[in-house]
């Protein structure tokens, strides 16, 4: 009695909890029902057994989850773990991470596919393939837009009330690929997955359930055949077969409309509720519309997948309705694991796959509590036709099984699984009770629905249109009907599936891929163009015939539909009778279920109590399982680390092998070079020995001839001596008398001569005292160009004299000597040159005591600088605006590069930016500086290979921008003692990387110009020069220059600037074709309509900006600060070399873009950049002064014995070459300015000494490049300039002109070298008879006349040369042409001049 009371009390507590918690408590999957506590918040508590949870987790791992299902599983799993573990140990699974990773995986696959298609099209160079890809992408864009409209329509449909909501909705969302890709070899777990919309019996208004994971439909699988069989089986109970397809649309809509009910459980909201047969209202829709809808649904992914071994609970496919089919209690066991609650008026449930829940089901079967009753889909149709509900079978078998279980099982032997089974049985009983009540209501509604359907069918009119869409819809609808009505046997389906599965397991992946249908590139676009071709249009007769055929088919279809309508009415009447009978059976069934529930309650309580005992034992099993999972994950991580280590070691081995191979190749090359050197040395020794032998023989012959001549001369001398003695003896007497008479006159003249001699000695002493150097005023020797500490002035000519060179040049000048002779005369005769020089030094050359003009000049210079800076700001603003337009234009272009180091360069560029951005404003730490140097070193090693692709890849990755950020550290320095944030060594490395990026890379140099990065380099260069070279008056320019300016940073900036401008010169686009220059922006065309192409505009702005910022003055100060040789100072030599190279590049670019004609001798000279004026004001930026000091200030010369040094080191030679190239480029830019500057007093003397010394060096040491530059420069100096022609033939012998005539014989025989020498000789001697006489002493002038005549007669030389396009740069060989070194209009006169014989 007490036991009965306790059970009764327990039963009352359970009932009270059930009454308070609702249907959520009845759906619990737990070990026990907590009797003492419950949640106050009203939320459900759901406890799940260990095996059940593990089954759910296994199912989640073995199935591909959609994003919507992920959210549902998260909420369900969280609820389960809330009761299994303590609150402190609760760990929520991060399903959102899985969803994000799955989404990233999809987009990664999409990106890879697009990249592969792009690479294929690019490699094939096929426009057809590109068009086909564009066509497919447009179609996919349309599909996704249609999907957006579909989702919006679904949301709108949910918000509408039930009365105004349509009964069905067919929507074609995805037209491009209605079926998913067929998985070639799916695993067993992936095949046995539940259907897309899993259904379960709903015993309440909103039951909290967990949606089962689902796979996307995989084409036409075995589950599709089951679906086809199911629809074919149920077709007999339907009114028309065509109504079996529209519910698929509802299933499609249900996947995307999910929400949570009032109790916090996630539910799937259908597109519209699936109403029962008695409550759903059928609209008045034509049969043609239903057929079209069935066709649309057949193309979508709305096919429900059914597991091969799951129990078919009963799914009645009709026009938006479903039949209620109760199943055996055993069938609900697994439905509690993964149920899917559907917010509908009527629900059914299906089971999970047998293989997915095999562990639970095997446990259930071992206990032998309940035997499973499988209801095939054929039974559903039989029950519907016979009117026998399946619940009768359940009611007959359940009491017998229950009694057998009660007799066989003892309460002490009940296992944990048995308690779970009994709990689920009670839950199923409650659900069946609810389902029975709903089924009764559904039967009543079904009856009413059938009545309305009969009335609607009787009032429905048949309306068949004959257009193409209706005909296509009808044809597709009939095909869908035939498919849905097809009959298939379940055994056939299983046999076919097993055959296909065995074939998949025995076939390799490659064979499966090869059996995929091939898709030739371009086939799609070809077929699209072929099908859309205008030639496929029908003629009027064909269209009329086609229309008549459609009319006939439509008439036949109308008759067919009328017959189907009659048949449908008959079936509806029969079904109405069946439904009424079914309603009566359901009422009887409800009574039997109540009796069965009372019998089962007592047994269930006993089982539930036994289950509590086993709960603790399962905890250890769960802990072991978690430990096993953690161990497995650790092993997987270890395996990944080992595989990465193996790949790393393999890569190191490959690099070592490559390094060893390169070392061997280098050693082989060195050995080959040494072998060639030994062979050349042996040949040279042989030639030397041969020459020595010949020289000895020649000396022996000469010595023998000399001895013979000497003997004959001695004999003749003795004979002449005897004759002379005899004649002298005869004349001695007569001469003695004459000598005595003349002795007095001679004595008088001798005294006068001694007096004049003493005066001359006194004058020379005075002159020596006047000269600071104490050197004789003979211009045959090179005087010093060092500025005087106190400047001198010629009071007669009012000329300022700054150095000894200017003094000698002025005193020897024609104007000064003429002025002295006009102002002074001695005894009516003209003064000699020595007298004029002596008088000038003694009387007219005076020291300047106070330089009164200095303040005024300084003020004027300051105002000029301010004006230039304002102009430079305007130019920079214009350049920045154009740079922004260029960058916006280049953003649309994808600069691709096939560099093998592209990824590495991108990473290194990002590292540079990161290191600069992370660092604060203070000085960098040593570790950060080391990291920066390592990064720059890696970039340097890659770019030193001089691969253009690597250079472009580094620029595209933002490398130049990162280098600019690094170099910004120089800007804050305002004086020499300022400590930089980044060490100078690192800055020099950055400059070196910048240089390597732009060296011989026209693309990068063009980008530096057009993106205005060149302005940053120039500003940085001017800033460095400003720090080390203070602003000075022109009179003392260069005296206060800090020697630190010649260090590496400033030199690197000069080198980079020269490299960029030089590359722009070498790769400058022509006027007709400009591949490297982007199209000129519209705004720029409006601002400067008269200007040339963008390249010319940008270069003009750049040169104008540099000139106005004072770069020329700063460089001039640096050049003037050099007062000695650079042999022992290589840093200074490199600085001077790159500075002269920068000036050379600026002159060459200015010549190319100023827009004047190609001829150098054109008088229409316009230089809007101001470069010519700046160089003219600074005497060629002091380069000639620097070169003179480098060449001559390193020697101590004795006026009587010493001669200038003519052997120079390589550093000096390179400085001389760059300086002469600058002279020649400036001469090409503005020849009169060059001749006037170099031909002025002082510089003309320095130029003559410099040219003579360099020619002497080239005569001793072979240096062709230097010799050619000197020859060309002398030609530009003397062409059409009589005063300069006199300079080259003056001085000590051999003069400059004589040295040109004494060049090796190859310069008079080799056509290539003749082209170099002869134009300079013609320029130096034309219309100068004295120079021509000197020339004729060394060579024949006929050679020059013949040279001119040959060039004049050469086809194309005389005619085409003057008509070169404007703005073209002089090439490496163009400046050697005669037309560019001597005016063409004077060729004939020059030829006549050199053919004319001079009178001796």
Swiss-Prot record:
InterPro entries, per database record: Matrin/U1-like-C_Znf_C2H2 (IPR003604), SCAPER_N (IPR032446), Znf_C2H2_sf (IPR036236), Znf_C2H2_type (IPR013087)
GO cellular component: cytosol; endoplasmic reticulum; nuclear speck; nucleoplasm; ooplasm; sperm head
Cellular compartment(s): Endoplasmic reticulum; Nucleus
Membrane-crossing segments per the record: none
Organism: Homo sapiens (Human)
Compositionally biased intervals (Basic and acidic residues): 539-550
Chain segments carrying region Disordered: 36-61, 226-277, 517-550, 701-723
Protein known as: S phase cyclin A-associated protein in the endoplasmic reticulum
A Pfam family the protein falls into: SCAPER_N
Compositional bias ranges of the Polar residues kind: 231-243
Keyword Mitochondrion: no
Residues found modified as Phosphoserine: 832
GO MF term list: nucleic acid binding; zinc ion binding
